[in-house]
Swiss-Prot record:
Transmembrane segments: none annotated. It comes from the Bacteria. Belongs to the HupK family. This is Hydrogenase expression/formation protein HupK. One of its GO terms (molecular function) is nickel cation binding. The lineage of its organism: Bacteria, Pseudomonadati, Pseudomonadota, Alphaproteobacteria, Hyphomicrobiales.
Length: 362
């Protein structure tokens, strides 16, 4: 069976003059995991997941392993839990940096080399089931810290003046003349059990268009920031979202370096839902990722569902749509660029197309 799927989100912005009257989102297609893997041994799936999920593949592997262990009634050893947390954090840092640069700005030679160094060092830390020697871990973390500094991010979350990142932040606000004052809601680990119960009960009907008591909460960097401090919906523009991402990169780098401070609650969480049933949540770069599995008596897959952050943030009634509807744009290309910047600041895990049309001219 082919593992290729339509990996793009189509976004249509309907304009009434300079005002966004509506936003339509055609979601990506998602791999039908139960249909692909029913009857296969759970242990055989781990090497396949990176082929299905090229971004945040470590987070997907950790979520799957944790869900399977929960279904089996097992608990990972403390050293394994710690290693999984480390590789999830390293991947999150790498993906946050990738989103700051890739498709946003052309990298000069120094910045490109620094990005490669981060990606290589993250890979050196190993996969979710591969512990690495402490000396290798220290070298990899030192390489990440040096590369992050080269990219212009300091430990105090400040941006180096004149850096590519500073220029990117400075240039991405100011063209969305006004934004609607939508009341935000944010996904947290406290919502996990409600979500995984729906995921197993309703399958793709839920994961394609999830909700939480009728609401579509935001997940990701901005939601994590909102969990730590009070923020205003009026401050949620592209530049503020980029600054939040940059601040989190610095925070993650510090944690990798020292590793002795509490980072967040529930970065990796698992739940036993009954005999042969388990689920897990992993807080990855773009938000909270869920896996849920049902196994038979021989640990073969009966049901396997997943819910990625993009399904919340790019929901037809979700945070992106609510951030755009009712906004007034500057005229011409600058206004369209402002919309593109806001869409990009939500950091979808797949590509997107953006089309502008006049309402009434469908």
């Amino acid at each position: 069976m082919s593992l290729s799927f339509r990996n793009e989100i189509d976004i249509t912005v309907w304009l009434s003059g300079a005002t966004i009257a509506d936003v339509a989102i055609q979601p990506r297609s998602r791999p039908p995991l139960t249909r692909l893997f029913a009857g296969k041994p759970a242990a055989s799936l781990l090497p396949v997941l990176p082929r299905l999920f090229s971004l945040c593949s470590v987070a997907h592997q950790v979520a799957f392993l944790s869900a399977v262990e929960a279904a089996q009634g097992q608990e990972a050893a403390p050293a394994t839990v710690r290693h999984r947390l480390t590789v999830v954090v390293a991947e999150r840092l790498t993906e946050l940096l990738r989103g700051l640069f890739v498709g946003r700005r052309a990298l000069d030679g120094t910045s490109a080399a620094a990005m490669r160094a981060v990606m290589q060092a993250s890979a050196l830390l190993g996969g979710p089931s591969e512990a690495v020697p402490q000396a290798l871990r220290r070298d990899a973390v030192a390489q990440i810290r040096t590369a992050v500094g080269t990219l212009g991010i300091s430990e105090d979350h400040a941006l180096a003046s004149g850096s590519a990142l500073a220029a990117s932040v400075e240039g991405c606000d100011g063209r969305l003349v006004s934004r609607p004052l939508a009341e935000p809601s944010f996904l947290t680990a406290a919502n996990d059990l409600d979500i995984v119960a729906r995921l197993l009960a309703d399958g793709a009907a839920y994961s394609d268009a999830p909700d939480l008591c009728g609401q579509i909460p935001e997940t990701g960097v901005w939601a994590r920031r909102a969990h730590r401090e009070e923020i205003s919906s009026t401050a949620a523009g592209p530049a503020a979202r980029l600054r939040a991402r940059i601040a989190e990169v610095a925070q993650l780098c510090t944690w990798l370096d020292h590793g002795d401070a509490d980072l967040e609650r529930g970065i990796v969480a698992s739940y036993r839902l009954g005999a042969g049933k388990g689920a897990a949540a992993v807080e990855c770069a773009r938000g909270r990722l869920y896996h849920a599995v049902v196994l038979d008596d021989e640990d073969r897959i009966v049901n396997f569902e997943f819910l990625a952050p993009t399904e919340w943030n790019f929901h037809a009634r979700g945070p992106l749509v609510q951030s755009l509807k009712g906004a007034t744009l500057a005229a011409g290309r600058p206004g369209q660029d402002a919309v593109r910047a806001l869409v990009g600041s939500f950091d979808p895990c797949v590509g997107f197309s953006l089309d502008f049309r006049e309402a009434g001219h469908a």
